[in-house]
From Swiss-Prot:
Catalyzed reactions per annotation: GTP + H2O = GDP + phosphate + H(+)
Principal localisation: mitochondrion
Residue sites binding GTP per the record: 51-58, 118-122, 172-175
Protein family (similarity comment): Belongs to the TRAFAC class translation factor GTPase superfamily. Classic translation factor GTPase family. EF-G/EF-2 subfamily.
Pfam families hit by this protein: EFG_C, EFG_III, EFG_IV, GTP_EFTU, GTP_EFTU_D2
Residues annotated as transit peptide in the record: 1-24
Source organism: Caenorhabditis elegans
GO cellular-component term (any): mitochondrion
One Gene Ontology MF term: GTPase activity
Designated name of the protein: Elongation factor G, mitochondrial
BP GO terms, sorted: mitochondrial translational elongation
Length: 750
């Protein structure tokens, strides 16, 4: 054998040995080989790894891949080997050391197929978390052992609740100074209102952290050998036995409060065995009544295998989650809800949701979650939105940037296909007549805008191609062309969001661009109800136009002030029902520009209560014009206000700088809500208008000698102060060369 051949053989033997070690990492027998895609439903898990930025979730995912034998070596997010973490495969992700887009992979863990989506932690990329959680059955919430529950944790928690996703909590970075699972536990209970309890106790503090106490099984676990591959069981250390017993009792009490079986045993003074506790944890986790809290350090290779075991033990398989769709009845055309079958066969037609689009080497890559039936290569599927017919030419499973060809995907699987021209959130089926609609994901509204243009005019074609692709892939990245200023405007979730796309245009399309000064995405809303009675009548020699509407425009409450609502509250047939779509169409068109600074109108409810029509002249265009002219009249007569995005800001700084930082935030009109101090660092949480937070990164660095950092996420829209509204309007008029109407009035009086 040649030297190269001997080297390859040795390398292969070493990989095989490592795989065997990984299989025995949790003292379980290796699974038998099963063909992927036909595994029983109870041996499938679809999970996401979610967290606040810099909590270590990508490192956690990297360890999962390694221990499951998916990769042969581990790399760090900010590694010195210039390789980077497997799931951060974009060049920009590796350069910046952050996750920008969600990435999918799958592993085999002792006979269970785990589909994993690693999601970004930065708030600017929150839509990636939204579309991941929409199609997942469970999640691992990663918390930092030092930081505990942080600002983005609140957002992730709301997203988990929105899609009813059960989760377990992994407290990471237990090797860091000041790390403790108790801070995370307190945050879960008192900040996020979860029924949570520890199932692990750390052994050793800070840099001496070297294992965990498994409170359910009643023993200690140590992670030894190269990469922590060997998991050694031992007795619980003497100095932890009393605390372990107390925490175990606390665990049982928290489960007994929400589980009938364990509750009865607790009331009857019966002690549950290990298996009964495991089963009770699973029952309560699946119904989102309990959150088990685990501990470990992904970077130091401790606790991850035990966490993967908990994913299999406690998180639901696809058959334990009820997934619904709406279809139209054949007789009346009314919508009705149906429950999708999780059976992994073709008894029922395929139903799948396209939840993510991505431009790949071979064209558009469309990620699917299969909810019912099976999808095979060569199948014809129909889009429920418009009935268009598409043939599935290639079917793959993703592992970060790599893919594996498959022939069939079954209910519960996550797969991808090429050449499917569609939009994110569309539902497809093999039954042309079924036309099911799965509930789509929540898409937050952009809060910041910038002008953008290519540096070189010759790059105009690539500039348009890049914008077209990125706006199709990311529904929170939007563009429009300002005819007045003759410039393209892009909008997104934050400065970083837009900067990343600008850099991608340069790296992926060889089109360097210039970004303008950031501007706030204001909204315009009514300050008080406005009653209207408007008649539209137009006679031009031919067919005339007529429409009359009466009703009220109400401002919506603060929790709904980003939408526009329309309702028919008429009695009788003064306005025929078939004309209301035209009124709605007119409303949808005119709310694009409000009366103050031509920002989008939001937070209003237009209620039509009465009116009249003409048998001939009340055409669709007549009713559209009736609505639009009524709104224009309201622009003159009603009390309109500006709404601005309010951001939740979390600043972490050395305690000696806390006073200066609080002062600086207050000067930016921030309302301080919480301050906390731990191990020499202070955390300041506040709410501040987005318009007042531009440039704060530089100021914070200056105030804290470069040691402070802050994160910011959208909280809500709220009315500006009258002074701020006057200032914004004056700046807008100056920018567009429009005279102040109040000044004209003053001159006339003189």
């Amino acid at each position: 054998m040649s030297p190269l051949g001997r080297f390859s053989a040795v390398a292969q033997s070493r990989r095989q040995l490592n795989n065997v070690l990984r299989r025995f990492a949790s003292n379980e027998a290796p699974s038998s080989v099963v063909v992927p895609g036909v595994r029983p439903i109870e041996r499938i898990r679809n999970i996401g790894i979610s967290a606040h930025i810099d909590s270590g979730k990508t490192t956690v995912t990297e360890r999962i891949l390694y221990y499951a034998g998916r990769i042969d070596s581990m790399h760090e997010v900010r590694g010195k080997d210039d390789v980077g973490a497997t799931m951060d495969f974009m060049d920009l992700e590796r350069q910046r050391g952050i996750t920008i887009q969600s990435a999918a992979t799958y592993v085999d863990w002792h006979g269970t197929n785990i589909n994993i989506i690693d999601t970004p932690g930065h708030v600017d990329f929150t839509v990636e978390v939204e579309r991941a959680l929409r199609v997942l059955d469970g999640a691992v919430l990663v918390l930092c052992g030092v930081g505990g529950v942080q600002s983005q944790t609140f957002t992730v928690n709301r997203q988990l609740a929105r899609y009813n996703v059960p989760f377990i909590c992994f407290v990471n970075k237990m090797d860091r100074n000041g790390a403790t699972p108790l801070k995370a536990l307190d945050g879960l209970r008192n900040k996020l209102n979860h029924n949570a309890a520890l199932i692990h106790l750390p052994i050793g503090k800070d840099s001496n952290f070297n294992g965990i106490v498994d409170l359910v099984e009643g023993h200690a676990l140590y992670y030894e050998g190269e990469g922590g591959l060997i998991v050694r069981k031992d007795e619980i250390p003497k100095d932890l036995r009393v605390e372990a017993e107390d925490r175990r009792q606390e665990l049982i009490e928290h489960i007994a409060n929400v589980d009938e079986t364990l509750g009865e045993m607790f009331l009857n003074d019966q002690t549950p065995n290990v298996q009964q506790i495991h089963e009770a944890i699973r029952r309560t986790v699946v119904k989102r009544a309990f959150v088990p809290v685990l501990s470990g350090s992904a970077l130091k290779n401790k606790g991850v295998q035990t966490m993967i075991n908990s994913v299999v033990k406690y998180l639901p398989d696809p058959s334990e989650v009820v997934n619904r769709a709406t279809v139209k009845t054949e007789t009346t055309g009314d919508e009705k809800g149906i429950i999708l079958s999780p059976k992994r066969n073709n008894d029922k037609p395929f139903v799948g949701l396209a939840f993510k689009l991505e431009a790949g080497k071979y064209g558009q890559l469309t990620y699917f979650r299969v909810y019912q039936g099976q999808l095979s290569k060569g199948d014809t599927v129909y889009a429920s939105r418009d009935g268009r017919k598409v043939r599935v030419q290639r079917l793959v499973r993703m592992h970060a940037a790599d893919m594996e060809e498959i022939t069939t995907a079954y209910a519960g699987d996550i797969c991808a296909t090429f050449g499917l021209d569609c939009h994110s959130g569309e539902t497809f089926s093999t039954d042309q007549n079924l036309a099911p609609h799965c509930e789509s994901m929540h898409i937050p509204e952009p809060v910041i805008s910038m002008a953008i243009k290519p540096v070189n005019r010759k790059d105009a074609d690539n500039f348009i191609k890049a914008l077209t692709r990125f706006t199709k892939e990311d529904p929170t990245f939007r563009r429009e062309y300002n005819q007045e200023a003759k410039e393209t405007i892009v909008s997104g979730m934050g400065e970083l969001h837009l900067e990343i796309y600008a850099q991608r245009m340069k790296s992926e399309y060889n089109c360097p661009v210039e970004l303008g000064k950031p501007t706030v995405a204001y909204r315009e809303c009514l300050g008080s109800p406005y009653k209207f009675h408007f008649r539209h009548k137009k006679q031009t020699g031919g067919q005339g136009q007529f429409g009359e509407i009466e009703g009220v425009i109400d401002p919506l409450p603060s929790d709904r002030n980003t939408v526009v609502e329309f309702s028919d509250e008429t009695f009788g047939n003064n306005i025929p029902k078939n004309l209301f779509p035209a009124l709605k169409k007119g409303l949808d068109a005119i709310v694009a520009e409000g009366p103050l600074i031509k920002s989008r109108i939001a937070g209003i409810h237009v209620r039509i209560q009465d009116g009249s029509t003409h048998a001939v002249d009340s055409t669709e265009i007549a009713m559209i014009n009736t609505m639009q002219n009524m709104m224009r009249e309201s622009f003159e007569k009603a009390n309109w206000l500006l709404l601005e995005p309010i951001m939740k800001v979390e600043a972490t700084v050395p305690t000696e700088f806390q006073g200066n930082v609080v002062t600086s935030l207050t000067q930016r009109n921030a309302l301080i809500t919480t301050t906390d101090s731990t191990e020499g660092y202070a955390t300041v949480i506040c709410e501040a208008p987005l318009s007042d937070m531009f440039g704060y990164t530089s100021e914070l660095r200056s105030l804290t000698e470069g040691k402070g950092e802050f994160s910011m996420e959208y909280s809500r829209y709220a009315p500006t102060t009258l002074e701020a509204q006057d200032r914004v309007q004056a700046e807008w008029r100056q920018l567009h060369g429009i005279a102040d109407p109040n000044e004209k009035g003053k001159k006339k009086k003189k």
